[in-house]
């Protein structure tokens, strides 16, 4: 399966881990999707989910200056997760920033409010500079 589908599963895993009553570990959360999606790139999913969780404070510090009158805590959970995922991938992978940004915009269109993809794209455009 494609990286795009793996990013969707990474997003859903991170969303699940953000639930207030969740005591799941990263490996437990990922194991829930393995049975239904054996063709996903689980190495990539684990790398992305672990990287975002392990570097959350640094990612938030990187993102915050570009939020214009917003704070990380005030963002929708979906937007916060997508920004963290994309920022981590831009900073820690060889994937071209343009590809990562496009995937983040597509995730936003799929999982967030109508026009939030413009906000996500604007923040990520500043981060990649």
UniProtKB/Swiss-Prot annotation:
Name of this protein? Transcription antitermination protein NusB
One matching Pfam family, short form?
A: NusB
Query: What are the recorded Gene Ontology BP terms?
Result: DNA-templated transcription termination; transcription antitermination
For this chain, the family text in UniProt reads: Belongs to the NusB family.
Function in brief: Involved in transcription antitermination. Required for transcription of ribosomal RNA (rRNA) genes. Binds specifically to the boxA antiterminator sequence of the ribosomal RNA (rrn) operons.
The keyword Transcription regulation is assigned to this record: yes
**Signal peptide residue numbers:** none
Supply the alphabetized keyword list.
RNA-binding, Transcription, Transcription antitermination, Transcription regulation
Q: Which PANTHER family does the annotation name?
A: ANTITERMINATION NUSB DOMAIN-CONTAINING PROTEIN (PTHR11078:SF3), N UTILIZATION SUBSTANCE PROTEIN B-RELATED (PTHR11078)
Q: Does the keyword Transcription regulation apply?
A: yes
Instruction: Write down the InterPro entries for this protein, in alphabetical order.
Output: NusB-like_sf, NusB_fam, NusB_RsmB_TIM44
Give the GO molecular function terms: RNA binding
* A GO CC annotation given for this chain: cytosol
What is the species of this protein?
Staphylococcus aureus (strain NCTC 8325 / PS 47)
